Amino acid sequence: MINVAIVEDEQEAVEYLSDCLHRYGEKTGETFSFTHFPEPITFLEKYKPVYDLVFMDIRMPMMDGMQAAKKLREADTSVLLVFVTRMGDYAIQGYDVGATAFIKKPISYFDFEMKMKRIIFAIRQRDSQVITIVSGTAVHRF
């Protein structure tokens, strides 16, 4: 199972991303568990390194996705990060925080599927090189 966090303030985008994940799962046999965070502050306050993949909007109230991504990287360097945004001009900055991909809004399923193939490959590759230790409620990756 692939654990996904969706950090997105637009409910329509959250619903479409979850539909895309379900559709992709039905097509490929992948299973996903996802948690939605409507704003990045709550996501960061509650963050534990249990996610394989984080979808994050860039333009959000109180803290933008780029700032949130920098803080995320302080807590977890191995989680895959995908920006979902209308703001394509942030693509270069995304490399500074190790973004794996950008998905442009409005989201097209074809684009989503193409990027997910690369993302799943990257998750599998990372997992083959990482040891995960679960101790109570803590998860550590080495």
Residue ranges and their predicted role:
Residues 66-77:
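Short amphipathic alpha-helix used as the core "switch/output" element in two-component signaling
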Residues 39, 64-67:
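Acidic catalytic/metal-coordinating carboxylates
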Residues 11-35, 74:
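Two-component/phosphorelay signaling modules centered on CheY-like receiver
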Residues 114-142:
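Conserved binding/recognition cores within well-folded domains
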Residues 8, 57-58:
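Active-site residues of response regulator receiver
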Residues 33-53:
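Acidic, metal-coordinating helix/loop segments flanking the phosphotransfer/catalytic sites
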